[in-house]
Amino acid sequence: MFALYSRALFFWLILFELIAGWRRWWGLSWLGPKLPRALLLPSLVGLRGRHVSMSGWLASLALALPPALLLQIAAGSLRNPRLTPLLRLRPGHYQQYTIERLDIPMREGHLPALHVVPRAGASAVVCVVHGSGCDKTSYAWRLVDTLVERGLALLLIDLDGHGENPRTQSFPAITENAEVAVTWLRARYGRVALLGVSLGGCVAARAVADGVVVDALAVLEAPPLLHYTQADVYREAIALVRPYLLDIFNDCTAQALIKAWEYPPIRAAISTWDLIAALDVSGSLAQIDTPLLLIYGASDAIVKPTQAAQVWAALPAHAAFHLVSGASHLTLILTPQVLQIVGQWLETTLITPPQRQTSH
């Protein structure tokens, strides 16, 4: 029985490895990209054995599937310890862009930031404001790649109370982060946009409503209020199981993903719940006349579609609104459809209009 179970376990490991190589999910591969996988096929065919009944083989496969999946994930992480996209968000020179670490002066303290510039340079820039409990690099690599490919620079900042920012999360001082970032960027770029995710969207919208001048504002999954239960948290975790998210393992291991979720506690003089209520994203958005993009996830268990509808009802007529099917709170910023919408809208808003005006 143990021998049959072991063969079933190896069957799954070989099958998973073949799939990982075919899909280029190197973060789930224990063989790596250079070794030939065709050599595994004969073993896969012969593992059942001649004298094993089909029912016994299927039962062994069912028992071996869960541990085999865990072993595959763990082996991929051990085999590829440096396969993490966060390495591409460190200061330095890369094939497509350069990254400079900044401490932008503020009235009190400073604003830590990463300045990402395409190799060919850029005339327009997007300041990215992260969500609660995150930092400037949180799941930002796909967004960085998307915008750099479209000729846009980025400024990734740490909000008060988060990451390397020495200041405490408080209201209304947190909106100074967006103000200082935009002022710094205005001195260097012709067109400037703000993009805020969740809490960052609330901060960005309030800053613009209070007078910060930008050429475009994109707000992703910003809550009018926080109302969720532990059951909603479980629903959000289940929503992580999305087929399109498996492609994240092209350049990331499971261990790297888990580490990307590890953040120190927020240093706060006001709770995130009270801060979001004070920022009043719906009231802020209603006052904004700059080009405006709103995106929410239809499977978001934290900012539910009913709350997205509340925000949509308050939007000015010129705003673009998208409710993306299948996207949850944690997966929205990684969703290819969302990245396509954001990238195309920002490119059109920040780069295309001036070119069209000069050609007519």
Identify what each model region corresponds to:
Residues 290, 304-313:
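Short alpha-helix in the alpha/beta-hydrolase fold that links the catalytic acid
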